[in-house]
Amino acid sequence: MRAGSHLEKAEPTARETSWYEWAGVARYAAKFLSTREEVTKFGAIGLRTGGEVVFKIAPYVPLGCMISVCAAGWLAYRGREKFTGEKQVFDEEHHRFIAGLDSQSYAPYVNCPVLLLSAVNDSKHDYDRVFDTFQQINPAVQKAFLYSSHGNGLIGSHSIADIDLFLDKYLKDMSVFVSDTVDLAVEEDEKGDLVAKVTFDKDAELKECGIFFTEQLSDAHARDWTRVLGSRADVRENVATIPLSIYEKSSRALVYAFANYSNNFSVTSKIQEVVIAKPYRNASLKSRIIYSAERDSLNGVSGFRRRARSIASCFADSKGVDAKLLPGYGGLLGATAEAGLVSYRVNEPRYAAPEEASLRLDAYCKEDAHLKIVFYFDGNEEKAYSAEVWIEGGGKWKSFCFDASDFKSQTGEHIDSFENAVSLVFIGDKEVLINNVLWI
């Protein structure tokens, strides 16, 4: 039997939902473990739906710790984005679900250490609201939070390191430093620049820090998160001041901060909405250059999630998922990924296609290859408009130029313009390097 609407509605009560049964089974398993003489301590890790179940049993069973991966409630808000400003109106069944079953309602009663892991651009959970649940967790317990920032909705290596260290501390009783969360404030400095002030754990040795930001508030799973690393000069004591260069015509932006410490434990802040109230000195101009390896490194591209290998549709196979830079002809770098490259910059105001624009790009491959270029105009990336080119192996970089009419769907429809594109994907049948993607 399928759970259907019972996953986000309590019809007629919580007892009639699948959650009630799943939580009952999990509580029974915990009770069984607690009666075993050889078990001195146990915890719970839940992936996606399993993470929601863990929240529902944590207040009632003696867990040593809990880890929730890509799950922290707000299921009744499915399809209702946080930052659109729309008023949320619910029927009685949804209200009952929020009060009796949604994980954020259980968070204040959790009494064991908690690690929450989330992934930006994930379409299967509400990552915008995960930190709202984190803030509601019982303040008396140790807790930590981390966004995985691949841009393809999958959990990466920093999160896996956090899992290992968290379990070492709370199940194996090892001496492991677990950091407090990162605090973030966005303000104007004395020069008239917009900056992010990031406050880190003063008791920790910082290894790396920075911010991620996007100017796209809607289409939560199709955002381009630009990373800005903090330099040593940016850090004073436990506060880093990092420049935040927002597109001059953007009225709002989303920002979060991250820190990686010397023991490899990482944490992030909440996603903070920033209202751009005035023009700032360091505002950015409109850019026709969507991606340049020299300028962007790996900002602006990531592994394409639709083709990415993963474990439980949750943990990334980093070798096949992550974008990487490799040298092509003349030592010039280009981006590639086994899963294919995706860029959500075409969905960002700063990089969106001008009227009647054409697309130009450079590509290189050591051997003969085919390259498919795909545009999606829907957030679910279901209907593809594609064009294909053949790349002769070796030699110099090859330049290609496309008009909108060159891109066709499987039924032969073509697009009239690149305006309102959500994502741009590059898929090669060999290791094809991409560089200098721009509108002309």
Which residue ranges define each predicted feature?
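Surface beta-strand/loop "capping" patches
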Residues: 168-213, 229-237
